[in-house]
């Protein structure tokens, strides 16, 4: 009886570990504070995301969404922009400091370097989390690396 319980517990633990690893392997997010001093309304953070075929197929697009993780401040919103090959898109977390992220946005640009920037609408420090995924046309996760250039 004890052996059955131990086996069941072990199998359950392994399944949960596999699920956690799969979610970790497919998810990319980064958090930071933009305008930590709270006095630069035009503060902008900048990173480069490199998308590549890691064996799951070539990248079709970069998916991005942003979440304001600070306390609510009326009129103070965070946005994320993606730029590649003379194309650009934007998404904004339209409710300051709630528990929901912005709508997702995608930029179709294939493999290569995408630029990801984060900005805000007014002075004031904002903690944010940006989620980003390089994906195939069928939304299968592809190779994704990030390098941060600027944190203001």
Name the predicted role of every residue range.
Residues 2-12:
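Bacterial N-terminal signal peptides that target proteins for export
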Residues 18-29:
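Sec/Tat signal peptide C-region and signal peptidase I cleavage site
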Residues 27-45:
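Short N-terminal segments immediately surrounding and downstream of signal-peptide cleavage
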Residues 39-77:
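Short, surface-exposed binding/anchoring microloops in extracellular/periplasmic proteins
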Residues 45-49, 74-78, 122-147:
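Edge beta-strands of jelly-roll/beta-sandwich modules across compartments, strongly enriched
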Residues 53, 98-109:
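Beta-sandwich interaction modules
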Residues 60-62, 107-129:
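Noncatalytic modules at the cell exterior or secretory-pathway interfaces
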Residues 72-92:
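Short, surface-exposed beta-strand/strand-loop-strand elements in extracellular ectodomains
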